[in-house]
From Swiss-Prot:
SUPFAM superfamilies hit by this protein: N-terminal nucleophile aminohydrolases (Ntn hydrolases) (SSF56235)
Taxonomic source organism: Actinosynnema mirum (strain ATCC 29888 / DSM 43827 / JCM 3225 / NBRC 14064 / NCIMB 13271 / NRRL B-12336 / IMRU 3971 / 101)
Subcellular location: Cytoplasm
The protein's Enzyme Commission number: 3.4.25.1
Coiled-coil regions listed in the entry: none
Keywords, sorted A to Z: Autocatalytic cleavage, Cytoplasm, Hydrolase, Protease, Proteasome, Threonine protease, Zymogen
Family: Belongs to the peptidase T1B family.
NCBIfam families referenced in this protein's UniProt entry, alphabetically: 20S_bact_beta
Gene field: prcB
Propeptide, residue positions: 1-55
Reactions catalysed, as given in the entry: Cleavage of peptide bonds with very broad specificity
Name of this chain's protein: Proteasome subunit beta
Alphabetized InterPro entries for the sequence: Ntn_hydrolases_N, Proteasome_sua/b, Proteasome_suB-type, PSB_actinobac
Length: 282
């Protein structure tokens, strides 16, 4: 059987662009070869208003030996609940995770591209990006969405990671927040929240945060903060015991970034709800 390029099964070949040496950034490669595939490759007529689902509240806090990030599950479209079980927290590589607030569709595309960006860099360079490098790459992607943000489709991620180069492993958990222009801000207080319920969540974390807590205590504080946000912000969804919908939680430690099993998050959420029956104000 003839398997040559002139036979029945032509030999597969990659386009020259795939073999040309260049940047270790997958985003740069995509921008050069297929810019229409970028999440930010959209144009909006002047004065247009687009109705789209929005993710709401994300919280993050450090603990002794790592960092936890958690998000509620509600997505809204104006005054309507668009989705009750949306996932807004994603593991992006072995030592980082991202939570999203803002326009859900664009935000999810950006996070997926960010995860590919990190894997691509590691394959090309043979090493992982530093935590600062990861935060800067995400900053550039948020900045690229500025035109959409001005049209009302803003994306505001919350980035967390474990710094494998930190001098003190107990304080290696880090949190980075962004504004819609892509400016990045390192959080020094040990906790942060973004989204519509962030004001209430941060107020809760101000009282609940303990830098020496273990992972279990930090997860409990995160769920408590999301409960408080849902209590006062209609766009944030609290634990739904009827539909069995609970926050998505990721911990990042020296062992890596891990999604908490739903059985564990549901048990913690149920404990929080039970405690609020006795003390509604927390």
């Amino acid at each position: 059987m003839d398997n040559s390029s002139t036979g029945r099964y032509p030999a597969a070949s990659l386009p020259p662009a795939y073999l040309r040496p260049g940047s270790s950034s997958f985003t740069d490669f995509l921008r050069a070869q297929a810019p229409e595939l970028l999440p930010t490759a959209r144009s909006f007529p002047e004065g247009s208003v687009v109705q789209a689902a929005h993710g709401t509240t994300i919280v993050a806090l450090t603990f002794k030996g790592g960092v936890v990030i958690a998000g509620d599950r509600r997505a809204t479209m104006g005054n309507v609940i668009a989705q009750r079980d949306m996932k807004k927290v994603f593991v992006t590589d072995d030592y980082s995770a991202v939570g999203i607030a803002g326009t859900a569709g664009i935000a999810i595309e950006i996070v997926r591209l960010f995860a590919v960006e990190l894997r691509h860099y590691e394959k090309i360079e043979g090493v992982s990006l530093s935590l600062d490098g990861k935060a800067n790459r995400l900053s550039g992607m948020v900045k690229g969405n500025l035109d959409a943000a001005l049209a009302g489709l803003a994306v505001v991620p919350l980035f967390v990671g474990y710094d494998t180069d930190a001098a003190d492993p107990d304080r290696a958990g880090r949190i980075v927040s962004y504004d819609v222009t892509g400016a990045r801000f390192e959080e020094t207080l040990g906790y942060q929240s973004v989204g519509s319920g962030s004001l209430f969540a941060k107020s809760a974390l101000k009282k609940l945060y303990d830098p020496d807590a273990d992972a279990e205590g930090a997860v409990r504080a995160a769920v408590e903060a999301l409960y408080d946000a849902a209590d006062d912000d209609s766009a944030t969804g609290g634990p739904d015991l009827v539909r069995r919908i609970f926050p998505v939680v990721v911990t990042v430690t020296a062992e890596g970034a891990v999604h908490l099993p739903e059985e564990r998050t549901s048990a913690i959420a149920e404990t929080v709800v039970e405690g609020r029956r006795a003390r509604p104000a927390g």
